[in-house]
Amino acid sequence: MNKRQQAQLGDAFAADGLCLDLARQLADTFDQARLQQIQGVLDSPVAQRFSEAERAVGEDGGAALASYRAQLAQRPPREERLALVQRLDGAAHTSELASLLRYEVGKTQALLALMARGDSLDEQALSRQTASQATALRASSVEAVESFMLYAYRQMPSAQLAAYAALYEQPAVALLLERCVQVLPQLFAERRALLRKAAKR
C-alpha cells in the first residue's frame, strides 16, 4: 500500500468520522427529545460513578486488573455477582460491540493483506472467509468484559450495580445500543468499499 492509500485508509477509518456517520445513521431513529432523554440517563450520577470506576482501572497501566484476572480461576466471583455483571453486559451490549469492532477490524486487515498482494475480495466473500473468527472473538470479548467489570466495580454494592444495569434496560437506551450493533457493520463495509475503489485507481 503506497502513501496515498495509507492516507485514504486513515481518512476512511478515522474515529471522528466513524462516530459522525454513526450519529447520522441514528438520527433517523431518534428525535431530539429522545436523544436528550438518553443523554440524561447516561449523564446521571449513577452512570458517572461507574464511569469513574472504569477510568480508574487504567491508572496503573492495567497491572492490578491483570493480577485480578490471573486469580479468577482460583477465586471465582459469587454467582449472584457474576449474574449482575452478565445482566449489565447484556443490557449495555458491551461484549457484543467489542467483538463486533474486533471482527470488523480483522476483516479490514484481511482485505488490506489481500490488496497488498494485488488481490481483493468482495464483501460477501470476505465475510465468508473471516466468519470463523467471529465465535472466538465473541468468547474472548465476553471473558475480557466480565473480568473487567468484576474488577472495576468490585467496591460497588450489588444494588448500585443493578441500578446501573437498569439504566441500559430503559427502552430508549436499549434501542440506541441495538441500532449501534446493526449500523456499525454497514459503516465498516462502506469504508472497505472505498478502499477497493481507491486500489483500482
Spans of model-derived segments:
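Extracytoplasmic/secreted proteins, especially bacterial periplasmic and envelope-associated proteins
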Residues: 4, 17, 21, 25, ...
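Soluble non-cytosolic domains of exported or imported proteins
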Residues: 12-17, 29-32, 45, 79-82, ...
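Surface-exposed patches in mature extracellular/periplasmic domains of secreted proteins
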Residues: 26, 34-39, 50-54, 99-103, ...
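Outer-membrane beta-barrel domain signature
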Residues: 53, 58-66, 70-73, 77-78, ...
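Extended amphipathic alpha-helical interaction segments
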Residues: 59-154
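Second-shell loop/turn segments in exported
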Residues: 7-13, 22-26, 37, 72-75, ...
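N-terminal Sec/ER secretory leader and immediately downstream segment
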Residues: 1-62, 195, 201
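A cross-kingdom marker for long, charged
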Residues: 138-201
